[in-house]
Structure formats: C-alpha cells, structure tokens
C-alpha cells in the first residue's frame, strides 16, 4: 500500500489557501479516483482506495501544519510501512512560482514546518515529496499572512493546472517512475 499525504490546516477558514495546497491535491485525487477521505483516524482524515491498480491511503492530517508529523508517524506505524519507500508528501513551496511543481526523492525540510515535523516524528528525510509552488511572499508581508492567504484568480488558474500535474506525478511515483516524473515536471 502507498500512503499519499497532503499537508494543510484543518479549519474551514484555511480551505484553498496557499498552505493548504496539499489538501487540494488530495481532494482532487479523491474526486478522480472516487475515494472518500472522511475516516477520522490517526489524527487525520483518511480514505483508502485503488489508483491505477495500486492500493492507496490518502491522508489529510488534522493536527495543524506544524504538528503534521504526529499524524503521519501514527499512520506509518499503524500500517507498518516504510516512509522512505511507501509514502509521498505533497505540500506548498514559496520558492516556486504558482503553477510549478518540484519532485524530490528525499531532502531536508527546507524551512517548511510541516516537513520538519514529519522528519522529526518519522526519523527520516528519505521520503518522496511533491512541492507545489505558491509564490514568494510580497516584500513587507508577514510569511504567515502570505501562506494563509488565498491565490489571486490568475494564480489560482495556474495552481489548478499544477494540482493536475501533482496528481499525475504521484501516480508515476507510485508506479516506480519517480525519475520519469522528475524529468517531466521538474
């Protein structure tokens, strides 16, 4: 089984904000593959199903971003899965412009508190990830205000395209085609 985690914050007021782009990708995967992500367990909303013939668990941690690792570690431990081999984490990246995605096989947190938490709680940096660009904060803005803000209509259109790319990349990665996904989307 593969676990695909989308990072975000649980309150309704955060829906479709920059920081919740991971949730948006999970919702799009759930819609496309008819998976209900409504089971409340492991401090998350979870949904199991099949994507392109592979068993998958879609996960939206409900711990708030900075504690995402609590939920992720609980999921991986419960199912006895290796995060380095059986998990993809999807999250926002302010260093990428809206509409871009970047795939990594492993790496540091790069300043992202949700990823810091996952690394701390799972004990590894070796998990695959898909970063979805949300754009740099405007000069003089507070970072929290930027990532908790919504996209302009122009940027939202670009982000919708990126969500589709992130979904396609996740499927390729589950199929063992991470290098191919990187060549297409990075």
From Swiss-Prot:
Record's subunit section: Monomer.
Active site (record annotation): 19
Keyword tags: Cytoplasm, Hydrolase, RNA-binding, tRNA-binding
SUPFAM superfamilies: Peptidyl-tRNA hydrolase-like
Residue ranges the record marks as coiled coil: none
Residues annotated for tRNA binding in this entry: 14, 64, 66, 113
Catalytic activity: an N-acyl-L-alpha-aminoacyl-tRNA + H2O = an N-acyl-L-amino acid + a tRNA + H(+)
HAMAP family: Pept_tRNA_hydro_bact
EC numbers on record: 3.1.1.29
Official protein name in the record: Peptidyl-tRNA hydrolase
Family, per entry: Belongs to the PTH family.
GO CC terms: cytoplasm
Site entry (Stabilizes the basic form of H active site to accept a proton), positions: 92
A GO biological-process term: rescue of stalled ribosome
